[in-house]
């Protein structure tokens, strides 16, 4: 009889070393960004103070931390922006319009046809993508 070890071997090249638990965004204020992302993702705000907010999703969390001298990322410049979200949606234009109503800004330069680039209220870029592209 062979015993199977349920704990992944961290030395294996096929085993994950970690799992994504949360992504944290920097902002000058937590509440507006927490409310924005709560509406966009449909995730509840589990914690909200002036210094920090956390939204909880089905398997991940989104944190928002106060950085007093936070500067908005510049897109599409390669400067401060380090990553962006790609969100799959069924109706690009309708969801983009709703995001704008919630405080997002549609960027002027739109590099693709199956996605729309916006910035959240703190300036973080994110893309709405056609859900059909994700299978």
Tell where the protein language model's regions lie, with residue ranges.
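Short hydrophobic/aromatic beta-strand micro-patches
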Residues: 24-26, 86-88
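Generic alpha-helix initiation/capping and coil-helix boundary signal
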Residues: 20-21, 92
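Vicinal oxygen chelate
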Residues: 2-20, 35, 41-86, 97-121, ...
């Amino acid at each position: 009889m062979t015993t199977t070890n349920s704990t992944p071997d961290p030395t294996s090249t096929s085993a994950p070393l970690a799992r994504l638990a949360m992504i944290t965004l920097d902002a000058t204020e937590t509440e507006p960004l927490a409310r924005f992302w709560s509406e966009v993702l449909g995730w509840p705000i589990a914690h909200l103070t002036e210094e920090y907010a956390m939204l909880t999703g089905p398997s991940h969390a989104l944190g928002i931390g106060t950085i007093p001298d936070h500067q908005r990322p510049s897109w599409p410049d390669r400067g401060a922006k380090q990553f962006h979200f790609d969100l799959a949606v069924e109706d690009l234009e309708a969801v983009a319009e709703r995001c704008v109503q919630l405080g997002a800004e549609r960027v002027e330069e739109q590099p693709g046809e199956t996605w729309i680039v916006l910035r959240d209220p703190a300036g973080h870029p994110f893309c709405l993508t056609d859900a059909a592209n994700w299978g």
